[in-house]
Amino acid sequence: MASCDSPDAFSWLQTLPPLSQWNRNSMSMCICSPNSIHPSLNFSLTRSPHSPNTFTFSIIANFKIPISLFVSKPLRIISSNSTKFLNENVISTLLMGFVDVVLNYNAKRTTYIFQIQNLTSTSNLKDVFNLAFFTFVFLICIYEAPTSLRTTCLKTVKDQLVTCRSRQGSKLLMVQLGSNLEEQWMRSLNLAITNWIIEIKAFQHLKSPSPLFSYAFSTQGLWKVHMYCPVIAMEMESVNSALTDERLFFSLNYHQLEGVIQFNHKIYVREKWFNIAVNIDNVRCDIIRLVNETLLSERGMGEEEKHFPSRISLQLTPTVQSNILMVSVQKSSENPLREFEVEKGIEATIEPPNTFFGLKVSANETTTKSMKPWKFEESVHGYSANLTWFLHDADDGREVSSSKPSKVSMMNPRAWFKNRYSNAFRPFTKQGGVVFAGDSYGQSVLWKVDKRANGKLMEFEIKGCVWLTYWPNKHHTFYSDTRKLEFKEMLYLNLP
């Protein structure tokens, strides 16, 4: 049996002989062992006694009488002349088995087609395999493991999932899955994390995990960043009161933030410098439910009581700045036109003789102005370009992310945030997200780079913050909060 100190499923499988040469029907690897008096958690492979090329994999809680927490369906592999158990066919079979288990924990159990493409040419295959394996084990621990094992084993598995190698493996696995299955994978994982955090907070015996998952890739002319995070795991920026309504708590916390940021970039060659122009292609943020609509209605307040994006801030910075000559933005600061409407009136009345004045005069003045709910700003700090979108209160013009609604507005059925997903003037999509595209926000940020940098790989750091705010939609409550998520990724481009 492999050691529990540093579980490595891929390396352990490489040590196994072919299935036909096993001297016993079952082989096991220790995943974690809390201590000598508690049972260990094992990953086990079991050969079918009736079919020499068929096996199952399982997760076993190794009590005095072992308990199977999960057993896969029988998996058949192709016979080969390999001297080891682990070959391309076995890797593909196991990897697809792990992925299938994770996807089946998704609230939306839709049919899917998944095949591993070009497995032998996949770089960091070991990292991809171990990432899928530990994600599978992570979900089994959350949903199936007894309390005596769960806490310690979850910490062991989480520590494996947050290593640099696992982060690289996760990016490569997402490429293999494709966009649709990637979303299902992250919803399965973040549903499990949400359940775990709620359990942690209920018993207060362990610090909440850091479940943000983000990745970026750079290709010719395009940068792209994906991010996913359960709402319950986001940092609380402000809150006006304790949330005691259990149904509202359920609705607000069983959602996740899904974000996509896309930039187009182009290099213009000049006599003495390069112009690197970066412009917004798409910035998308959605708040997606993690459980089905029926459960949200029965245990919560329905799907429409959820957070909405209230501020998005992005910063792009070249990491090596010795060859940067200047940076400029193309959007001016706001100089809004304000419209005034002045109404004046005089009202005269005759008062009784014993009053000091016999005439009353009153005047009134009305001011109106028009504004869009979302305001976009560009700014520069050093060689960093900052892009920020602010949502403003349609009633008083304040920034939503840094303010709280009054109790009067919370009870007003005509307030802008009431019925916000069906209102014709909503500042969101029908589903409650936002899309900022190049048609309205296509201005470029321009860096001038010295010609001596030709042929070099330029590295840019993108740092971002997303704020989500909850103000009541249809539910009658005075509760409100704003949460924040921070992320950081690296982007690359080659200078000619």
At which residue positions do the language-model features occur?
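Long amphipathic alpha-helical coiled-coil/heptad-repeat bundle
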Residues: 2-110
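Short, well-ordered strand-loop elements centered on a beta-strand within folded domains, enriched
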Residues: 3-5, 58, 93, 275, ...
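Intrinsically disordered, low-complexity regions enriched in Ser/Pro/Gly/Gln/His and often acidic
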Residues: 5, 15, 178, 189, ...
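Proline-rich intrinsically disordered, low-complexity coils
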Residues: 7, 17-20, 28, 33-34, ...
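Generic structural motif
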Residues: 34, 48, 119, 239, ...
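Deployable pore-forming modules of oligomeric membrane-permeabilizing proteins
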Residues: 83-84, 88-345, 373-429
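Membrane-insertion modules used to breach or fuse lipid bilayers
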Residues: 330-383, 413, 419, 423-495
